[in-house]
């Protein structure tokens, strides 16, 4: 009888542990320690799909500085560029200024059960409605005024002491931006490892989410000379897309502009200043 009770108790504990571990988790390894987040892939599927595919390097993204389409782990080596004591820690900005991302944006995703109701909430940073990209933050306290403004997609389940440590990193006022939450030395995300437990988590494919997330792709273009002697570049524009023109004289340093929607621009003034240039066009499709 005692043996049966012990076996039953062990089975119940095992099932309880299994249910607690089931899900999709992101393990952050930083230079300040390790912490683990649970990702809400059932209630915020598109936001989680974006984060997971960037973290594991399965989704192409645009290196805005070099004008390269990359498909490699996005967050490795990036810092927490914002440390707002008692509020949030924020990361996911390649240039460390908080004004960039993966080259595309996607829409907000709100769920009535997902709220900024405690410390350790994982949520998307944005520059206004429907401007999500790669930047995220983790709360250091309840922040209910962020509900329905920022998309919650996870929470810290292990390592809150590391989050608290990150939240106490010394900061200074940024000399150019004037922000008072710039870390003297930004803590670094060394890697993010994704772990799946359970059937639903294993079935979740971030590349087969519906509606699909925006794509980064090269644009086919053609250069031609008009009867008036103007050198122009033309391409087939895609409605709603953000289309980039990158130019370089040495293949090392690139400058970029956002292309106009009409699908044709003059290169004359550029080529008068730089007779030999390399150019490439890249597109971020619109979020459906």
Placement of each model-derived feature along the sequence:
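Bacterial N-terminal signal peptides
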Residues: 1-14
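Cyclophilin-like peptidyl-prolyl cis-trans isomerases
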Residues: 15-246, 251-253, 259-278, 285-288
